[in-house]
Design a protein with these regions (language model features):
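Nucleotide-activated sugar donor-binding and catalytic core shared by glycosyltransferases
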Residues: 1-369
Length: 369
């Protein structure tokens, strides 16, 4: 069995695909899983580390771009369809799984036109442009949220939840302390702005130090900055004397969640799936320019259920963030309630559900032959 998993660009699209690949290999060790993505997406960094082969095509996103960049992206999309045809004829997959985003468009569309079984995964409550189009061609669509059903044909749509990698749920707190060089017994805050970092979150967290300086010796941070802010953020930690580990990118996300007493992050669907799978209290800061405002909608669900606190980007400042950090640091009871609510929302078996659908599609296709 050969499975092509197409997409990436950001961790939010890519990591659910890795979770599905893990489950496929768990069920059928001989399964051949190949990823397709772009050389400038996060998949070029992550997939080789995960041990899967990856093939590249030409593709760029069009949403939120200037007119000239949209024209360029449109041309690249045409190229991606031609590239996909070449790759799929070489790989001869039994099924193609699309993860959403621009890198999935060419492979899934081409597979559908070649009568190769296709599955599309949609992580957000408001589907992106690529999946809205691909949903018309795909054999099956796997959704995270019920609200997404209206965008797709109901008879081909399944609510599976958003797949989470096994390493997210199996990581242990004790080993995570050693991995990140953190002190046992200190209140640990994990900060990240998504797989690519977030300049505003980095700045506001650093600005909060002056408001929580009195508890400096009792807390520590694990802070993923992204490449561009790494040096400046690290220097700010040194200047204020706050303890912790500052890194451009965290590869061991499961360990990062395991060691955290509190998470401060954006509200991408994959981040929320991981948070709820492990039940971590969080302060969520939705990215304000996400398509369809889906991050705010995602975060609002958790906030309403008591699993997280939400601070909108336009309301975010260092003093507000510091107040929330202090409140949650001082109230173990509140954190425990948030943890319980978060776990109740998690779907740690989402990868199994998606693979069930993939396998049923393959069985149906084989019967038809």
């Amino acid at each position: 069995m050969r499975v092509v998993i197409a997409g990436g660009g950001t961790g939010g699209h890519l990591f659910p695909g890795i979770a599905v690949a893990e489950e496929l290999k768990r069920r059928e060790e001989s399964a051949d899983v190949v990823f397709i993505g772009t050389e400038h997406g996060i998949e070029a960094l992550i997939i080789p580390r995960e041990g899967y082969p990856i093939r590249y095509l030409r593709s760029e996103g069009v949403v939120g771009k200037s007119l000239m960049k949209k024209v360029r992206a449109g041309i690249q999309t045409v190229y991606s369809v031609f590239d996909s045809g070449t790759l799929l004829r070489q790989l001869r997959p039994d099924v193609v799984i699309g993860l959403g985003g621009y890198a999935s468009f060419g492979p899934v569309l081409t597979a559908a036109l070649m009568s190769v079984p296709t599955v599309v995964m949609e992580q957000n409550s408001v589907p992106g442009l690529a999946n809205r189009i691909l949903g018309r061609f795909a054999d099956m669509v796997c959704l995270t949220y019920h609200e997404s059903i209206s965008f797709f044909a109901k008879h081909r749509t399944y609510i599976t939840g958003n797949p989470v990698r096994q390493g997210i749920v199996t990581a242990k707190r004790e080993s995570a302390y050693d991995l990140f060089g953190l002190e046992r017994g200190k209140f640990t805050i994990f900060v990240f702005g998504g797989s690519l970092g977030a300049k505003k979150i980095n700045g506001v967290v650093c600005g909060a130090f002056s408001y929580i300086n009195d508890i400096r010796e009792k807390i520590q941070f694990l802070h993923q900055t992204g490449k561009s802010d790494y040096d400046a953020v690290r220097e700010t930690y040194r200047k204020w004397g706050f303890k912790g580990t500052v890194t451009a990118f965290v590869h061991q996300m499961g360990n990062a969640y395991a060691v955290a007493d509190l998470v401060i992050s954006r509200a991408g669907a994959t981040t929320l799936a991981e948070l709820t799978a492990v039940g971590r209290p969080a302060i969520l800061i939705p990215y304000p320019y996400a398509a369809g405002n889906h991050q705010e909608l995602n975060a609002q669900k958790l906030a309403e259920m008591g699993a997280a606190r939400m601070i909108l980007d336009h309301e975010l400042d260092s003093e507000t963030l510091a107040k929330n950090i202090r409140d949650l640091y001082e109230s173990a009871e509140t954190r425990h309630e948030m943890q319980r609510s978060s776990r109740s929302l998690g779907k740690p078996d989402a990868a199994q559900r998606v693979v069930d659908i993939v396998m049923s599609l393959l069985r149906k296709d084989r019967k038809a032959v």
